[in-house]
Structure formats: C-alpha cells, structure tokens
C-alpha cells in the first residue's frame, strides 16, 4: 500500500510538471 501511494504521488508530480510547466513553455 505504501509503495502504491508513493508511485501515485510521483506520477502526479510528473504529470503536474509536464502539463503545468510544459504547457506554459509551449503556449506562452
């Protein structure tokens, strides 16, 4: 359960990085 929680948080951070920072780079 702990491992799954860690992976979910890591995945969410990566998604935020790509969709947040990435979109700002492409669309600004």
Swiss-Prot record:
GO terms for cellular component: host cell cytoplasm; host cytoskeleton. Its main location: host cell. Changing residue 14 to P: Complete loss of granular structures in the cytoplasm. Keywords: Host cytoplasm, Host cytoskeleton. It is found in: Host cytoplasm; Host cytoplasm, Host cytoskeleton. Plays a role in the reorganization of host microtubules and intermediate filaments to form a cytoskeletal cage that surrounds the viral factories, protecting the site of viral replication. May play a role in viral infection of human cortical neurons. Product of an upstream open reading frame of the genome polyprotein gene. The initiator methionine is coded by an unusual start codon CTG. This is uORF1 protein. It comes from Zika virus (isolate ZIKV/Human/French Polynesia/10087PF/2013).
């Amino acid at each position: 359960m702990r491992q799954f929680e860690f992976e979910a948080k890591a995945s969410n951070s990566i998604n935020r990085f790509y969709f947040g920072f990435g979109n700002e780079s492409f669309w600004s």
